[in-house]
Amino acid sequence: MLDLFKAIGLGLVVLLPLANPLTTVALFLGLAGNMNSAERNRQSLMASVYVFAIMMVAYYAGQLVMDTFGISIPGLRIAGGLIVAFIGFRMLFPQQKAIDSPEAKSKSEELEDEPSAHIAFVPLAMPSTAGPGTIAMIISSASTVRQSSTFADWVLMVAPPLIFFLVAVILWGSLRSSGAIMRLVGKGGIEAISRLMGFLLVCMGVQFIINGILEIIKTYH
């Protein structure tokens, strides 16, 4: 049971900086201004469900995609590392606010014409929370843990759905209490946390690339 808690904790530490619910909160506040409370709550719940579904598909179908297209694990690690590092650099040195992103702009225009427009899948679930970096990390981690003997088989079977469920619950709670979070942390606080998470992502991305290169050297040496 202790191994299960360790696996869940490790999964959350890896995924939460990538998912970064606080930036999704800022985006949600910008897009949901014209919605009533019931509609905001519904969009929050749907976004969380979509995030859970995307992560589950990435974890369980990722290996099939790799086999179909002939993608090796070192190649995936290097590609995933580049994506994660790029996202980290963008969080460290943001060029545009979340509300100014193309996805947010198109949704803002929809909301002006249609108050009940859906923002749960795009941009809240994808790409804000479960974006390319998150998906690459999940697929790469799935390939890695299946080859490792760190955790028992039952832990590797039970932990991933629980990790994805907890990420979805954290996102749901953050979106439901978005107003309170923004008042408590403030815009500057969210930016500071985003930059800190960006630095962590750059470090994780570089380590991914190093691991991929070392595995290539070990394979072909």
UniProtKB/Swiss-Prot annotation:
GO cellular component terms attached to this protein's record: plasma membrane
TM segment ranges: 8-28, 45-65, 69-89, 119-139, 155-175, 197-217
Keyword Membrane recorded: yes
Cellular compartment(s): Cell inner membrane
Periplasmic side: 1-7, 66-68, 140-154, 218-221
Pfam families named in the record: MarC
Domain of life: Bacteria
All ranges on the Cytoplasmic side of the membrane: 29-44, 90-118, 176-196
Keywords: Cell inner membrane, Cell membrane, Membrane, Transmembrane, Transmembrane helix
Keyword Cytoplasm appears in the UniProt entry: no
Membrane-topology descriptor: Multi-pass membrane protein
Coiled coil location: none
InterPro entries xrefs: Multi_antbiot-R_MarC (IPR002771)
Family: Belongs to the UPF0056 (MarC) family.
Protein name: UPF0056 inner membrane protein MarC
Species, as recorded: Escherichia coli O9:H4 (strain HS)
Source organism phylogeny: Bacteria, Pseudomonadati, Pseudomonadota, Gammaproteobacteria, Enterobacterales
